[in-house]
Swiss-Prot record:
To M.pneumoniae MPN_373 C-terminal region. The chain crosses the membrane at residues 160-180. It is a single-pass membrane protein. Its main location: membrane. It is found in: Cell membrane. GO terms for cellular component: plasma membrane. This is Uncharacterized protein MPN_373. Keywords: Cell membrane, Membrane, Transmembrane, Transmembrane helix. It comes from the Bacteria.
């Protein structure tokens, strides 16, 4: 999913292109597209003569679909994303972390100091509010001229399907309950009839 796309984005900062394979057709995983995302790592002053490494992604070359997939599915941690894209997200984050650690081992060190992703990542709310501090490592997301929110594009459909699925389960459960309840009542009624007939015969 993640590989080195080569290139250099800034002479004054370490960087290159992060190549990510995105699958467009969920029914045919073999039909996929690959996008190259320019990135750079900068040392920025954070006060008290301290510097903080900043990973800067440039998403300006992505179309809305690509932006939504990468930013929405891979960089957020909402419950919807966790449920739907957790395996993809964890794989992407692990590969990205390994890729950056290997490539910048001398500059950063492979002892966890370059731990870009921990159990959590940027939430959709943080993205909206522009909060980009991530476990002591800053992530800067340069959008492509517009605010494409993955959740606003996908949620209505998924929510509709989810509600429909839940409704169908509830309806099926209710129907099953009613059928079973009616069946039990019918059996109870039949048992009572038989019992009354038996008692009637015994009194004769």
């Amino acid at each position: 999913m993640v590989s080195d796309g080569g290139g250099q984005t800034d002479n004054n900062a370490e960087g290159g292109n992060l190549r990510i394979a995105l699958t467009k057709n969920a029914f045919n995983p073999n039909q996929s597209t690959t996008v190259d995302i320019p990135y750079k790592i900068e040392n920025r002053s954070v006060g008290n003569n301290k510097e903080q490494k900043t990973l800067v992604f440039d998403f300006s070359g992505l179309n809305p679909y690509e932006y939504n997939m990468i930013v929405g599915a891979l960089f957020t941690d909402s419950s919807f994303i966790n449920d739907a894209y957790a395996p993809i997200q964890s794989t992407f984050q692990r590969q990205l972390k390994e890729f950056l650690q290997v490539k910048y081992e001398n500059q950063v060190g492979a002892n966890g100091s370059f731990d870009l992703f921990k159990p959590r990542s940027l939430s959709s709310q943080q993205l909206v509010q522009g909060e980009r501090s991530l476990d002591g490592f800053t992530v800067e997301l340069n959008a492509n001229g517009g605010s494409f929110n993955f959740l606003t594009h996908v949620d209505p459909l998924v929510a509709g399907l989810t509600v429909a699925a839940i409704a169908s389960v509830v309806v099926a459960g209710a129907v099953t309950y009613l059928v079973v309840r009616r069946y039990r009542k019918r059996n109870e009624f039949v048992d009572k009839i038989f019992a009354s007939n038996i008692r009637a015969k015994q009194w004769r």
